[in-house]
């Protein structure tokens, strides 16, 4: 990934002060290049990101069109966006300092990215020379330290300059008494699909709910659903909830229809975007917990093979879990 341009706008909500830069950041500095690029690369993979499309007739969409044509300078685009962000956020944000980085990032295509970095307090060391010539070390407090690339940004949005598709994650805020997404709803003015995490979570919840309602523990059904989600991610960046419940409940039409009704109520009767890396991890392991407090985590594929694990019903209606072909047990 290459960061071509970047600008930094400072939002100090402790004093309702905003500072807009008149110059771009020096992205030729390798440390700055790496810092921004690493944050963007990580944010691209966030399973909590929602997707949508920016309309080119929206206020910011029009500015991006001008920018693509060369009629609007990057630093002016950044300042305009910063002013819009601050106008909405100052009414919906706690007393914190947020440094906003706006950049042009290039991978296989070009993106305009918005990184909201919430500053935090941190300490570093400093070396002093005393009057008598001896050396002293001190802890020095810094009040506005940005998150490291290993830490999550407060909010992030990327707009593909080719098709104006958007990936975005952010916390909700309250504006004029209404709880909403400030960046998506107010600044960019776009509708979004739910995140990969929410999509997978809802599919699992529906499968579990329908299974439990029809006197099943849901283990087989859930592991089947998770396995399908993971295998689908090997070839597609969307997941079809309808196909999943049809396969999971193929032996029981009543359960299948109940699951489809739940999907319809959740507006999930269509293929939905999913982060392939996240979806693949979903299908790796399944965890169960008994009412006696025992927890077991096992590879999803093992539920299809009775040589490793099997859940049986005793004559008195209780369950037993058999773990097989074990050569060694390790404490964790």
Where are each of the predicted segments found?
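Long, hydrophobic alpha/beta structural blocks
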Residues: 2-282
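C-terminal structured domains
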Residues: 246-332
């Amino acid at each position: 990934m290459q960061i071509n341009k970047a600008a930094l706008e400072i939002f100090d909500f402790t004093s309702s002060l905003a500072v807009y830069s008149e110059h771009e950041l020096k992205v030729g500095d390798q440390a700055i290049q790496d810092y921004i690029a690493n944050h963007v690369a990580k944010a691209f993979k966030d399973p909590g990101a929602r997707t949508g499309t920016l309309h080119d007739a929206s206020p910011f969409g029009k500015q991006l069109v001008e920018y693509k044509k060369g009629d609007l300078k990057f630093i002016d685009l950044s300042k305009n966006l910063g002013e819009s962000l601050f106008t909405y956020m100052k009414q919906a944000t706690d007393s914190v300092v947020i440094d906003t980085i706006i950049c042009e990032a290039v991978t296989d295509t070009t993106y305009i990215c918005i990184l909201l970095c919430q500053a935090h307090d941190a300490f570093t060391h400093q070396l002093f020379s005393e009057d008598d010539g001896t050396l002293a070390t001190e802890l020095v407090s810094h009040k506005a330290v940005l998150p490291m690339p290993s830490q999550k940004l407060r909010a992030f949005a990327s707009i593909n300059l080719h098709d104006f598709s958007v990936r975005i994650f952010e916390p909700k805020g309250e504006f004029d008494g209404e709880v909403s997404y400030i960046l998506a709803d107010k600044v960019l003015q776009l509708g979004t699909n739910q995140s990969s995490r929410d999509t997978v979570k809802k599919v699992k919840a529906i499968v579990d709910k329908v299974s439990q309602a029809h006197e099943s523990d849901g283990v087989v059904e859930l592991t089947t659903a998770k396995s399908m989600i993971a295998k689908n991610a090997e070839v597609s960046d969307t997941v079809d909830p309808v196909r999943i419940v049809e396969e999971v409940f193929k032996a029981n039409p009543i359960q299948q229809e109940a699951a489809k009704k739940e999907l319809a109520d959740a507006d999930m009767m269509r293929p939905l975007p999913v982060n392939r890396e996240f979806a693949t991890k979903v299908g790796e392991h399944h965890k169960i917990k008994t009412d006696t407090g025992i927890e077991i985590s096992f590879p999803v594929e093992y539920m299809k093979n009775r040589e490793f694990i099997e859940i049986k019903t005793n004559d008195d209606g209780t369950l037993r879990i058999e773990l097989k072909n074990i050569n060694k047990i390790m404490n964790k």
